[in-house]
Amino acid sequence: MVKLWAIVVMVAIALLRSTFAKQLSCTMELDRSCSLIGAKVSSDEILTTTFASSNPSTLSTVQFARSSLTGIPPAMFQTFPKLESLNATGSDIKQIQSRNFADAKTLQSLYLRGNKIHDLPDVAFFGASRLQTLDLSDNAIATIESTAFKRLRELKTLLLGSNSLTELQPGVFDDLSDLERLELQQNGLGSIDDRLFQGCHSLTALNVSHNALKTFNVAQFERRWSFDLIDASYNKLSVVRIPPNLRQLVAIGNGIRTVESTATNGSELILLKLPHNKLTSVDEVPVFDKLITLDLSFNRIREFDFRSAARFGKLVLLKLDGNQLESVSNSLTAPITHLKYVHLADNQFTHLDLNVLRTVPRILKLDLRRNQLERLAVTDLAGSFPVMVRIMLEGNRFRCPDSRPLLKELKESITAYAMTRNDCRKEENLIDGICCS
Ligand SMILES: *[C@@H]1O[C@H](CO)[C@@H](O)[C@H](O)[C@H]1NC(C)=O
Ligand SMILES: *[C@@H]1O[C@H](CO)[C@@H](O)[C@H](O)[C@H]1NC(C)=O
Ligand SMILES: *[C@@H]1O[C@H](CO)[C@@H](O)[C@H](O)[C@H]1NC(C)=O
């Protein structure tokens, strides 16, 4: 008898469950999208939850807001067979099961940023073969099975930043032949295998910053076409080897002492940003003939001659702020006209003669802030630097009597320089726009 009752109760519960299986409804807007606000799906409801909307067969976009879903109910993709974009950002999602997206045949964008996903199982996105954008940033992903991204041959953007990855399985990106942009920043990656990206024939932008990489073979991205940007900042690299097809390399805050080029016949590099590393000379950077921006600020450079800048025939912006320069020299015999912006702030100049820049006549902006300049000499500013529109002098220690000749030159030129009272230290006076004492 007791047994029978138990069975009756269980059957009743089962019936109730299916009769009252959770249904999430939304109203389709004119743009074929709908929002599900405040939806709640617990782990035992994932497989039974159903969806409803007016005209579900044409719905293209679903957006969750203020929702708490343990997982994405697969019924969504059966009810909305034309779904192209699903945004479940910040929705408390904890799990993705293998083939969760088996029916997501038209899905192109999947936004799962800011959830609580710990792992991506085998064939996690199997079925969603039209996917182009997959945002998994800011989760707690520590494990990605090697087939998790299987068959995502149209995927262009994969965002895995701010997770807990310490390693990546060989082959995990092998099917991503259309992938253009990959974000892996802010994980705990200790190494990246040289063959990890061998299947990613279209990759042109990669962010591996804020990991724990001791080595990273940038040269593996040598291809016949150009690779746009690699950001390897805030790792523990001491060497970078730059392939000829790379256009921009950013590697701030490593321990880089050596920069190499693997180019034998010209390089595509236009931007090289290496602040906060351990380089001791501009000449340690090999020649890149198309380089436009070279940022070596906050390294350990003690000497600089403008001849080093002339090695880069297209260089426009040179940043050497925050080094240990006490002076600069110039052994150039012919002028260079490409260099237009020179940053020398936060060095240790006490005296500087601007005539040292006479072979850089097209300079537009010169930054000398926060040195210890007491005197800045120049003869014929307007004539030597006819296009210099700005000189930045804040945070120095100019002597008032010594700055009169400089002021005269400045007033006769187009160069803006003026400081304000706020730029001066307490004991300083502001005289004709220059703080001095
Ligand atoms: C996804 O939703 C979040 C808020 O829930 C919003 O901030 C974000 O812009 C949306 N993303 C897209 C691509 O619509
Ligand atoms: C790479 O990611 C870091 C951290 O999120 C970010 O600050 C940086 O701007 C990104 N790099 C590029 C080139 O977008
Ligand atoms: C080097 O580059 C020039 C022009 O960019 C090209 O004509 C030449 O064939 C290249 N040589 C080699 C060995 O690739």
Residue map of PLM features:
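Solenoidal tandem-repeat scaffolds enriched in leucines and small polar residues
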Residues: 126-128, 132-264, 268-278
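Consensus "Asn ladder" position of solenoid repeat domains
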Residues: 67, 91, 115, 136-139, ...
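LRR N-terminal entry segment and analogous cap-like coil->beta motifs
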Residues: 31-92
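Conserved hydrophobic beta-strand positions in leucine-rich repeat
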Residues: 60-64, 86-88, 107-112, 131-136, ...
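Leucine-rich repeat
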Residues: 42, 55-57, 70, 78-82, 94, 102-107, 118, 126-131, ...
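Leucine-rich repeat domain C-terminal region
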Residues: 225-227, 340-341, 346, 350, ...
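Cleavable N-terminal signal peptides of Sec/SRP-targeted secreted and luminal proteins
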Residues: 3-21
